[in-house]
Amino acid sequence: MILMFDMPTDTAEERKAYRKFRKFLLSEGFIMHQFSVYSKLLLNNSANTAMIARLKENNPKKGNITLLTVTEKQFARMIYLNGERDTSIANSDSRLVFLGEAFPDET
């Protein structure tokens, strides 16, 4: 899922709403690609539907929020015209991720 948003930040109340929404996105596991462009890997349509429901519950009163659902394969084919691809584990579509130190070679 790719989420793009544009929210006003003119008043203290609007800035507070912006910070609250951004914190919500991060707490839900979204990764920031650019300012106001976030993504989250959702493994199936049920997870996608549930995430949309949570986003609707935490929808700020002002601004524009756009969602785009793409497959893992489509996301992996994203073209970077400038800058580098984020290769962190958090941005991986791998089903199995090993965390911690590498095991020594037992040969």
Swiss-Prot record:
Its domain of life reads Bacteria
GO terms for MF: metal ion binding; RNA endonuclease activity
- Give a yes or no for keyword Nuclease in this entry: yes
Top-level EC class as recorded in UniProt: hydrolase
Which CDD domains does the record match to this protein? Answer: Cas2_I_II_III
What EC number(s) does the entry state? Answer: 3.1.-.-
User: Which annotated residues bind Mg(2+)?
Assistant: D6
**Which keywords are on file for this protein?**
Antiviral defense, Endonuclease, Hydrolase, Magnesium, Metal-binding, Nuclease
The family database entries (Pfam families) matched by this protein are listed as: CRISPR_Cas2
GO-annotated biological processes: defense response to virus; maintenance of CRISPR repeat elements
Required co-factors: Mg(2+)
* InterPro entries documented for this protein: CRISPR_associated_Cas2, Virulence_VapD/CRISPR_Cas2
**Whom does it interact with, and what assembly results?**
Homodimer, forms a heterotetramer with a Cas1 homodimer.
Q: NCBIfam families from the entry?
A: cas2
Record-stated family:
Belongs to the CRISPR-associated endoribonuclease Cas2 protein family.
Q: What does this protein do?
A: CRISPR (clustered regularly interspaced short palindromic repeat), is an adaptive immune system that provides protection against mobile genetic elements (viruses, transposable elements and conjugative plasmids). CRISPR clusters contain sequences complementary to antecedent mobile elements and target invading nucleic acids. CRISPR clusters are transcribed and processed into CRISPR RNA (crRNA). Functions as a ssRNA-specific endoribonuclease. Involved in the integration of spacer DNA into the CRISPR cassette.
Q: What is this protein called?
A: CRISPR-associated endoribonuclease Cas2
Q: Which organism is it from?
A: Streptococcus mutans serotype c (strain NN2025)
